[in-house]
Design a protein with these regions (language model features):
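A short core secondary-structure module
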Residues: 148, 152-196
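Helix-loop "lid/cap" segments that line or gate small-molecule binding pockets
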Residues: 93-102
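Flexible, small-/acidic-enriched active-site or ligand-binding loops
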Residues: 137, 190-221
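A short, Trp-centered hydrophobic/proline-enriched beta-strand micro-motif
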Residues: 118-126, 170
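Long, acidic (Asp/Glu-rich), low-complexity accessory segments flanking structured domains
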Residues: 213-235
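Alpha-helical interface subdomain recognition
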Residues: 1-85, 102-107, 114-119, 134-135, ...
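Short glycine/proline-enriched turns and hinge-like loops at secondary-structure junctions
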Residues: 65-66, 134-136, 160-164, 178-181, ...
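Short Gly/Pro-enriched turn/cap motifs at secondary-structure boundaries
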Residues: 88-90, 115, 130-133, 157-160, ...
Length: 380
């Protein structure tokens, strides 16, 4: 089906992204996978190419473009290239809105220029060893000491945790307040008592550094509070729809790409004296996946447009995240199966797509949490 949501400007941007991937990412990606981390030079290159801070106002060095379709193009092309390790979506679409929407003028001038050049890499630290989806379980504290915050606690599974120069930390500022006693406080590289643990060894997305973070009596200036004190819960809920849309966009793009490479494979691979594509079972498998992808694509494109226009609600963002990522997981499994033993070999793209994509139904809100949000809203 012909997609109708992109203009010539979006198409030109897509070509820019593809050129960037070809020149600056793919030649180095295998080394990054071995190293378990992307080079900082790649971030600087992304900044020079104008791929960072797409929605940041021009006065702070950004693109000044809040059209989410550009972010969708970026997510689609990085997914198709099999290069999720350079986490531009995390930087642009998850942390970016907190800085542009909540930061004071002084904070914007301090942080946003580096955000857009790639000199300042960002992360957000919510998850803790004992608190994932349950924000009320957060134990990291930020004690008001008059002229500074004193932060103690730990975080885990933090994307960009090793590289990050600026970490948005979710911490308790009113311990008895539960989820409504949380605040967002920015901790910068070099803060005394702020330590990074090991770069965690994951089954996929190995070049995307994921770390434990530790805070031992970390003194943070009072002016590093982001947004309202005790306002983190509302701030997080406001921005989660965009995070989930970014994940959903990558999910359907991955499913479509897996279907594409598997369709090519079954046409070329022979068994029992003929191409696999001549077997009825194979044709049924391809037909089912193609139909599921087409239906999901139609829904996702509608959600992309709605989000670009500011009309997408949390329920439909949750539907998109749940459905697209679960589809990605199913398609990855079926496509690997159709590759037979070759699908289990790391040199085949389907193998890496299988392991890289498995996290999609977990981070940004698990499938189970998405269903809870949808069901709770419909039955309220």
């Amino acid at each position: 089906m012909q997609r109708q949501i992109f203009t010539e400007e979006h198409d030109a941007f897509r070509e820019t992204v593809r050129t960037f991937l070809t020149k600056e990412v793919l030649p180095h990606y295998e080394q990054w996978e071995k190293d378990g981390i992307v080079s900082r030079e790649a971030w600087l290159a992304a900044g020079r190419q104008g791929l960072l801070g797409l929605a940041v106002p021009e006065e702070y060095g950004g693109g000044g473009n809040t059209d989410f379709r550009y972010s969708a193009v970026l997510a689609e092309e990085f997914t198709r290239a099999g290069a999720p390790g350079l986490a531009l979506g995390l930087h642009n679409d998850i942390i970016g809105p907190y800085l542009t929407g909540l930061a004071t003028e002084e904070q914007k001038r301090r942080w946003l220029p580096g955000f857009c050049t790639g000199e300042t890499i960002t992360a957000i630290a919510m998850t803790e060893p004992g608190a994932g989806s349950d924000l009320q379980g957060i134990r990291t504290t930020a004690e008001d000491k008059g002229d500074h915050w004193l932060i103690n606690g730990s975080k885990t599974f933090i994307s960009n945790g090793i590289l990050a120069d600026l970490v948005v930390v979710v911490a308790k500022t009113t311990p008895e307040g539960g989820a409504k006693g949380l605040s967002l406080i920015v901790v910068e590289r070099g803060a005394e008592g702020f330590e990074r643990g090991r770069n965690l060894d994951k089954i996929g997305q190995k070049s995307q550094d994921t770390a434990e973070l530790f805070f031992h009596d970390v003194r943070v200036p009072k002016e590093n509070l982001l947004g309202e004190r005790d306002g983190a819960f509302i701030h997080l809920m406001t921005n989660l729809a965009q995070e989930r849309m970014g994940i959903a966009v990558a999910g359907i793009a991955a499913a479509e790409h897996l279907l594409e490479i598997t369709t090519k494979y079954v046409k070329e691979r022979e068994a029992f004296g003929r191409p696999l594509a001549k077997l009825q079972h194979i044709r049924f498998e391809i037909a089912e996946m193609a139909t599921e992808c087409a239906v999901t694509r139609a829904f996702l494109d509608r959600c992309i447009v709605d989000h670009s226009e500011g009309t997408l609600d949390a329920v439909h963002a949750s539907m998109a995240k749940w459905w697209a990522t679960e589809l990605q997981k199913r398609v990855a499994d079926r496509c690997l199966q159709l590759h037979g033993g070759y699908g289990y070999m790391a040199e085949f793209p389907v193998a890496r797509a299988f392991t890289d994509g498995r996290i999609q139904t977990i981070y940004g809100g698990t499938t189970e949490i998405m269903k809870e949000i949808i069901g709770r809203s419909l039955l309220a």
